[in-house]
Amino acid sequence: MYLKHIHLYGFRNYHEQTLDLQSQKTILLGNNAQGKSNLLEAVELLATLKSHRTNRDRDLILEGKKTGQILAMVERTYGESELGITFRSPGRRSLMLNHENLRRHLDFLGHINAVEFSCLDLDLVRGSPETRRSWLDTLLIQLEPVYASIIHQYYKILRQRNALLKVIRKTVEEQENSSNLSAELSQLKVWDQQLAEAGTRVTRRRYRVIERITPLAQKWHQEISSGTEILAINYLPNIKIENEDPQQVQQAFLDKIEQRRMAEQQLATTVVGPHRDDVEFNINHTPAKSYGSQGQQRTLVLAIKLAELQLIEEVIGEPPLLLLDDVLAELDPNRQNQLLEVIQGRFQTLITTTYLHSFDAQWLNSSQIMKVEGGKIAQL
């Protein structure tokens, strides 16, 4: 997999910029707030249709513009593909593949794969459960593009069920006609079933991906820590499951919904389902979030990112792109060397940095070095 070029128009702080990628390794050099991370964000959007920095398309469009666009050419073993995303404010984004407009996200996803590693990824360990759920979902979308539709459908059902729970609470509080309440409770049973079915599809996939990535991350973690630390990754689903059998998982959903029915009606929100899942990271049997040093947390995240690269390559049959956003400065020399040694010429890599002294001469000589300043990119 090779990203040959990328063109940005009205995206973030770029008026119009084309970058031809002529090396397996591209170093983007520049001060902060010049546009280095914006370029990596564009690649992330091409891979996942998501940004880890914002949920609003308006934020992706250059100030004063009504549209922004990312165009790219990617080369795979089966041939070349031209990808395009157009953002509108107001309006919905549109997707393009080989000059044809696409109606479904599913048809766009999977043409380019990327793993991003930035200093923000420490939030994976010390941040909220929402951060860890988002990490799982982003990984799953790249491994199985149909997952984007599965998770979208789940949250759509969740919103509709929550709306009905609010109506039910209002009916109870205002002591309205009991026949209205009876009809609403019957309707809730229908949403219970839909939530359990959609939630089962999400839970089973999250369960499986944790099972697959854990041994890979443990292997990398052993290597980076020189065998002094033991990593454990535990999926903490909101419902108790023994295995990923779909019937058992779905029944566990329905049982817990029944147990929490009164609480949900009082709170007027759904408290059962994968939107309440979490992932736990332990180092030497101790929660990394609470007790891990910053060095241990960085080692953990680096191991996970290397495991992501390995897992995606195993599943899709080609190495994904690696996006390193000002991360070398956050790593000590040992971890820097581990990371750079793994990359070598195996993964096409885009690296942002404010200085070059983290790289040895051999790395610099084999890299394309670009200067980024004020939304403009030029060969150094």
UniProtKB/Swiss-Prot annotation:
Chief subcellular location: cytoplasm
Source domain of life: Bacteria
Keyword terms: ATP-binding, Cytoplasm, DNA damage, DNA repair, DNA replication, DNA-binding, Nucleotide-binding, SOS response
Keyword Metal-binding: no
SUPFAM superfamilies in the record: P-loop containing nucleoside triphosphate hydrolases
Family (UniProt): Belongs to the RecF family.
Name under which the protein is recorded: DNA replication and repair protein RecF
Species the sequence originates in: Crocosphaera subtropica (strain ATCC 51142 / BH68) (Cyanothece sp. (strain ATCC 51142))
